[in-house]
Amino acid sequence: MIHFGTGGWRAVIGDDFTKANVQRVAAALARRMVREGSADQGICAGYDRRFLSREVCIWFCEVMAGEGVKVYFVNLNCPTPQVMFTVKHMNLPYGIMVTASHNPAIYNGIKLFTFGGRDATEDYTDPISEEANSLDADSVRVMDFEHAREAGKIEFIDPRDAYLDSILAQVDVDAIRRRRPRIVLDPMFGVSLNGLITI
């Protein structure tokens, strides 16, 4: 059973969080976008460092492309706020992040964002859940990821610099430099690693 809560749809990998259910969610969202006329504007898709997150994001995007939605694929694991920022920065109607946030390692999930990079409300997620649960897996249209890239349906993006610049613009970096503090940081295999290397 697919059900979006306040933090998105989260479930145990291999139980409710399966490839077929991921594809159903993608198809339900894609068809909503087609009905709204926002399919050509596109969607930003990102993923964290959890087990299977990149693969899940690929499965999701293959359906979006197959259903006729343009995809901007963040081609490097990233923090959830980076996808939210990118939805706003690129003026996109939707974004998704493959993550289960703070849940145990056996979970994964999908967070949905709407225009402005906001968390999707129940007005969006309830109809998507309902449609996804009613879909027959065989009715879902899938386009191979590499084929979709070649066809321009999926485009790789790296919004890291724009995201980090937006954060650093709010920080007095010179004051930090003048203090020359010693900082010990352990990203704990988390998604902050790529941003920290960039900074």
Ranges and model annotations:
Residues M1-E67, P93-Y94, H147-I183:
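An N-terminal, well-structured beta->alpha segment
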Residues A20, E55, A105, V191-N194:
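Residues that form or flank phosphate/diphosphate-binding pockets in enzymes
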Residues A28-A30, G68-V71, M97-T99, A120-Y124, ...:
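Glycine-rich loops and low-complexity Gly/Arg-rich segments
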Residues M33-R35, V74-L76, D126-E131:
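Short C-terminal domain-edge/linker segments immediately following a structured domain
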Residues S38-R118:
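Ferredoxin-reductase
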Residues N108-I199:
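Gly/Ser/Thr-enriched, mixed-charge loops and adjacent short helices
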